């Protein structure tokens, strides 16, 4: 009895500690940042105060998983002014990322930064820092990326940089550094270096530096073999070794007459060219509206220049609008500089994976054919961004200008349900097991049900499909791309994949309803059960509509033929699959008023999952051999 009492007391104490830890702040780190903020006085307002929680609310601050320490501070372009006060930032001993770029910070490199032993990413570019660089960089053994460009640092480049075994990017451009360039050839991980426009750097250009682009060391004094200093400048256009005779003399004209003719012809050509460009521009405006750069100008990988991601910024005050509680702190310029990879092109635009300078990955959706004005667009974004639910992909920020509309989300590395179900059906494919498919179904149902409660129970997703459902770290389904039909131009009659998801009563995408969402969700359930796309073709090029096909197979009482062949290796799931099929079929009935509500579907699917028994894959049987061993039979696919 005494032992039981001690056990219960220990359990209560542990629970109290867990609850306290979940709601506690990294108090010492918090005090350090508040002191820093008080002295630096940023011109841009930050939501930092003593009463708010650091890890969940403070802009530009990221904590570790248990919320006990701050590991990243990102405050680019917030108007920080003056010298970094000692014993503030340096007290964040668990800090890994520090970005204070594009501010008005002055003074020398803070000596007490040596306390930041875990620092991996350091961005202090575009400030007014001066004085020598730290003598011993080896105290930051985890440094991966350093950018100190566009400051006033002087003195020599420390040779201790050669001991940064993990360094991948080093930018010291546009300072007043002097002396020889140290030997950094041992840095095998170094992928980018920029020492350009440090005009007092001297000595021969090392061989290891020549493997980098010429722009990495322009504007540096070098010593050629003759011993005289020469300024490294970009190579000029191809020069001719001898002077050619004047063209005027070939024509028998005086150079004055020839010059007048050239000027007259040039004026005519320029006038004609301007007329042609004006006509083309007007035609393009009539054909495309406001005119956004075409998608084929966007690279699938590589840096996104302003010309390739955002065509232009007409209003310099336009900037990314972040939602409260978002701990990201980057700006449009960061996105423009980020490396980008096209993840997919959907109904409402193209989605990119953008990797920022501190290795943070975000998903950026570039919308097309937005019909709403700025005010209506922003109101809809506020509704979408206000939804906080574990099964809804959270909108972190958005951007609106005349030519560009962007939405920023967290990046889900596991990809979409569509890619997991239909991508890579070859030998190396890792099939989705039944338990994961159930978690996807339950998660997506909860997410959509939460969406339907928003805006006084009137919000509609409008574009539910497997490519808009993602897997989180626990393999639960998370719904993305919600609420966009309200701001988009009406789509043409559906074709291809989109036709397979759209409810029969929907003729105008702007008039989608919650019951049409239910229909689309039912199609996703059928995808999970059959492994087939909503619109697919047979080997004979026959186009198959998934909903119609399932109806016909079930009507002929060949229900077993419906299910994905990859699910047949699991035992004890037949009853669950049949129940899920019945739920899916109730969602895709033609009469909208006969479909269940999403809240009811959550309960029905959870009931199926709660009755789950032990599910184990059956051992695979080898094909029948000559001695009579049996082989498994599988239903033929359409």
From Swiss-Prot:
Identify the stretch annotated as signal peptide in this record.
1-24
At the top level of its lineage, which domain of life is listed? Eukaryota
**LRR repeat windows:** 94-117, 118-139, 142-165, 166-188, 189-198
Keyword Glycoprotein listed: no
* Keyword list, A-Z: ATP-binding, Leucine-rich repeat, Membrane, Nucleotide-binding, Phosphoprotein, Receptor, Repeat, Signal, Transmembrane, Transmembrane helix
Polar residues bias locations: 627-638
- Please provide, in alphabetical order, the Gene Ontology terms of the cellular component aspect for this entry: membrane
Residues with the Phosphoserine modification: 339, 416, 419, 513
Its record classes its membrane topology as: Single-pass membrane protein
Q: Where are the transmembrane segments?
A: 257-277
Subcellular location(s) per record: Membrane
Q: Where is the Protein kinase domain?
A: 337-608
**Family annotation (Pfam families):** LRR_1, LRR_8, LRRNT_2, PK_Tyr_Ser-Thr
InterPro entries recorded for this chain? At_inactive_RLKs, Kinase-like_dom_sf, Leu-rich_rpt, LRR_dom_sf, LRR_N_plant-typ, Prot_kinase_dom, Protein_kinase_ATP_BS, Ser-Thr/Tyr_kinase_cat_dom
Q: Which residues bind ATP?
A: 343-351, 365
The terms under GO molecular function for this entry are: ATP binding; protein kinase activity
Where is it mainly found? membrane
The annotated region (Disordered) lies at 612-638
Note what the entry says on domains.
Answer: The protein kinase domain is predicted to be catalytically inactive.
Q: List the protein's name.
A: Probable inactive receptor kinase At4g23740
Taxonomic lineage: Eukaryota, Viridiplantae, Streptophyta, Embryophyta, Tracheophyta
């Amino acid at each position: 009895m005494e032992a039981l009492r001690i056990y219960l007391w220990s359990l209560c104490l542990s629970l109290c500690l867990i609850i306290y830890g979940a709601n506690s702040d990294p108090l010492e780190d918090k005090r350090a940042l508040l002191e820093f903020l008080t002295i630096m006085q940023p011109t841009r307002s930050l939501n930092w105060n003593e009463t708010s929680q650091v890890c969940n609310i403070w802009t530009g601050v990221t904590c570790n998983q248990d919320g006990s320490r701050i590991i990243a501070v990102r405050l680019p372009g917030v108007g920080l002014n003056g010298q970094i006060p000692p014993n503030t930032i340096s007290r964040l001993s668990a800090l890994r990322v520090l970005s204070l770029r594009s501010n008005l910070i002055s003074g020398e490199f803070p000596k007490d930064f040596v306390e930041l032993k875990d620092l991996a990413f350091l961005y202090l570019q575009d400030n007014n820092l001066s004085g020598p660089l730290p003598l011993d960089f080896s105290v930051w053994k985890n440094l991966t990326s350093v950018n100190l460009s566009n400051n006033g640092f002087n003195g020599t480049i420390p040779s201790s940089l050669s001991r940064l075994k993990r360094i991948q990017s080093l930018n010291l451009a546009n300072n007043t550094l002097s002396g020889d360039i140290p030997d950094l050839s041992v840095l095998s991980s170094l992928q980018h270096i920029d020492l350009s426009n440090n005009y007092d750097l001297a000595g021969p250009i090392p061989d290891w530096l020549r493997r980098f682009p010429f722009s990495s060391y322009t504007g540096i004094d070098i010593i050629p073999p003759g011993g005289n200093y020469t300024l490294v400048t970009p190579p000029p256009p191809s020069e001719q070794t001898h002077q050619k005779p004047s063209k005027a003399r070939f024509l028998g004209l005086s150079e004055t007459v020839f010059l007048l003719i050239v000027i007259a012809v040039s004026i005519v050509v320029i006038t004609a060219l301007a007329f042609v460009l004006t006509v083309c521009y007007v035609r393009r405006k009539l054909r495309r509206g406001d005119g956004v750069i075409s998608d084929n100008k966007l690279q699938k990988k590589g840096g996104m220049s302003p010309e390739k991601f955002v065509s232009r910024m007409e209003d310099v005050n336009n900037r990314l609008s972040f939602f409260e509680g978002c701990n990201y702190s980057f700006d449009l310029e960061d996105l423009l500089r980020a490396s980008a990879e096209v993840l997919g092109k959907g109904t409402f635009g193209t989605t990119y994976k953008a990797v920022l300078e501190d290795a943070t990955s975000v998903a950026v959706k570039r919308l097309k054919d937005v019909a709403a004005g700025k005010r209506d667009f922003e109101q809809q974004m506020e509704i979408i961004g206000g939804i906080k639910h574990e099964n809804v992909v959270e909108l972190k920020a958005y951007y609106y200008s005349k030519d560009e509309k962007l939405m920023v989300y967290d990046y889900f590395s596991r990809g979409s349900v569509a890619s997991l179900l239909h991508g890579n059906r070859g030998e190396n494919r890792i099939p989705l097991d039944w338990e994961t498919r159930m978690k996807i179904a339950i998660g997506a149902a909860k997410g959509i049900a939460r969406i339907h409660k928003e805006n006084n129970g009137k919000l509609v997703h409008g574009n539910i499909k497997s490519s808009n459902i993602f897997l989180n770290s626990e393999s639960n389904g998370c719904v993305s791309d919600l609420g966009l039909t309200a701001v988009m131009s009406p789509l043409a009659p559906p074709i291809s994949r989109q036709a397979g998801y759209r409810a029969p009563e929907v003729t105008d995408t702007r008039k989608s309803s919650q019951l049409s969402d239910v229909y689309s969700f039912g199609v996703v359930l059928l995808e999970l059960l059959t492994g087939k796309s909503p619109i697919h073709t047979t080997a004979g090029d026959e186009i198959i509509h998934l909903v119609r096909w399932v109806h016909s197979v079930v009507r002929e009482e060949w229900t077993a033929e419906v299910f994905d062949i990859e699910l047949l290796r699991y035992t004890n799931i037949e009853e669950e699959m049949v129940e899920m099929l019945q739920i899916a079929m109730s969602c895709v009935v033609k009469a909208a008023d006969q479909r269940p509500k999403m809240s009811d579907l959550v309960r029905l699917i959870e009931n199926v999952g709660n009755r789950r028994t032990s599910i184990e894959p059956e051992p695979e049987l080898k094909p029948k051999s000559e001695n009579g061993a049996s082989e498994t039979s599988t239903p033929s696919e359409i």
